[in-house]
Amino acid sequence: MTKEQLLHQIANIGYSTSYGRDKCYSTADIATKTTWRITILGVFVALLCVLYPILNNISVLAFGVIGLTILGIYLRPYTDNKYIESAQKLERIERQLQNLYFEVKANNETEPRLNVYGQKLEDLDDQQKTASISSQVLGSDWYTHVKLFWAKKINSQWFVDELKLKFFF
């Protein structure tokens, strides 16, 4: 494997790790914030029903409350701390990958040293695969892309430049 190929591979795994980290954070954000919004909306609707008894007779209101309850039930499993813990592990691995990337980029040695870097990369890739969670909440992909390419550009610039990534195509 050449130095350029190794750098590209490190950046590729760095992207996957960063994406997995942001996806876990996105799932936790969506589940936590949406659950709170449902709770606040439920309290607001209950207060309206108390203040305006005519609303108690409207079946649309009942279907709305049922829909919000189903959404709350769907989001409940995603409020677990395992998503935050996984994101924190992936964040540490991403930092190690970033350090490895810059170490390889600065190194002008020959082939034997690249094998050591390749082994470090394999170890970090295995750690990343172990730390990631495959089950994520609906909408976390979109939110992850916004975080990765829009909100946190500085943190991801090293692999974005190497892989020539863009927000749209």
How would you name each of these model-derived features?
Residues 41-50, 65-69:
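Hydrophobic, membrane-inserted alpha-helices
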